[in-house]
């Protein structure tokens, strides 16, 4: 038995938690460089604000309607997510963190001692008490059905109280008959159009379709979905995220970069951040790649994009080695005379240990005290805030940094941003 817990309008809700003056007002969160809408609360949805709406096209409408805009505050969202997930882990013996704002909880055995709907209400109330965030809870025998139950809990929140238990077969079929097939987890626009052309219009139609027909006309993924809709668990709980195959750190610049020193600062910063992520995964890497590109949509400007990579002989997780390799790659592809829009650093070829056969000609032999130094650096930055300790190559005045003109305070992670009671 699974419960899917999903925070309602997560990014927008994180902003209103610390701004009670915004309760009941339309709130949206913008993407990198304040480009377009990536999150909106119920009040903003009621005004017709759509995901992906460009901010510069909608700012007059937002001003007239009193829509409050925020730049993406990822540091705040990550910390609030950790608080939600920690609460769920206290309430359930096993939890799979599916994304920043949703998780699957294992309820095996719970139904033997608790009413599942009451337990879902307890989850909802506890998360609300500890974080002031509202979650929808969908409960069912499979992950796909739990997703469907969660969808119903959020769509009909007033009637359901934000909790839907679909463990009853009759309730399952009643809900499935009321929902279009594209509401099913994992079914995109292309597949839903094909299903519609075959006369499969509702979720119940799909659940009742012969498995042999699905296998013949589609793939094993959709077959698994149909089995899950019938209450047959095909997707197990994954408590530990699979090991990453690569790490990418890239951004679009707030202002176009035209000079080499600024680009080198950006690449150093991205390499340092990628190395930090690598260490958090307890991995070492040998492959470091750098890419730079101009905008393909710029008028009267030639497009240029290129990448280069370095393969180290010895796996490393030391920021100094990774920055050195990334800047060497930059030197191989840099061309003056362009207005660069984006750059990034990618790490690959991971190892669980930084061990390799060395010879006299290795140019990146392990540095003495490397692990201890990186641990001190990560610990200090985690405690005092990212960027407290950084490399000189990252620069001080980073004019190219991502634009976040409407950034809210980092209320939970920066002592300087703590709320003050007057």
Tell where the protein language model's regions lie, with residue ranges:
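Short, hydrophobic beta-strand segments
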Residues: 103-109, 307-313, 357-362
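Flexible loop/turn segments at secondary-structure boundaries
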Residues: 145, 298-299, 352-354, 397-399
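C-terminal hydrophobic structural anchor segments
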Residues: 321, 327-383
